[in-house]
Amino acid sequence: VQQPMIVKYVESLHNGIQSQALSRYAIGYILRGTKYIYDGDKRQTLSRGDVFYLGIGHHYIENFPEGGQPFEQVLFYYTPGDLQRILMHLNITYGLNISNEHSCENCRNRSHVTMPAWNSLRNFFINTNNYLRDEDFRHDETAENIKMTELIYLIASHEDCCIKSKLLSNVDAAK
């Protein structure tokens, strides 16, 4: 059975720090609440409107509901093969040439990166959240692939940044 590419998580209770083991890469967006990602003795705080990348492996996270409302996030999962297929499709079909000159200590040394989402990315995730309310969408592989392609396009065509750098570094893992 194919694992879903797009998942919405809703947590109404604070469950403390959790260990999350990922077998695929993930790009997520905070819809409501606060998320903490732990890196050794450091803690990164994410809030509504932040986009984040999680690499394959273990992550220590904590999700906080806010103001009596549940914590909500949308996550897109992908493999290096998925990413390579989508980038090739964007290049062949639309002539999208992708380059990335960005490199900083943050994205070189961490298995996660976070940043505020830019407008088109924020709108994309809000729209995806609306799609996920529709039961039919949840089991539609074609719709998931189209949304995933749109997400990859929005990141790959954006100016150089940590999220783009991490995403494009995952193509190398497919070779």
Where are these regions (language model features)?
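Short, Lys/Arg-enriched, Trp-marked, Pro/Gly-tolerant hinge/linker segments that flank
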Residues: 105-119, 132-175
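A general marker of short, structured functional hotspots
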Residues: 5, 49, 114, 120-121, ...
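Short, flexible segments with low predicted structural confidence
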Residues: 17, 55, 122-123, 149-151
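A short small-residue
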Residues: 60, 129-131
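Exposed alpha-helical structural elements
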Residues: 82, 120-123, 127, 162-163
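N-terminal regulatory/effector-sensing and dimerization cores
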Residues: 2-102, 137
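Aromatic/histidine-rich interaction motifs
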Residues: 91-126
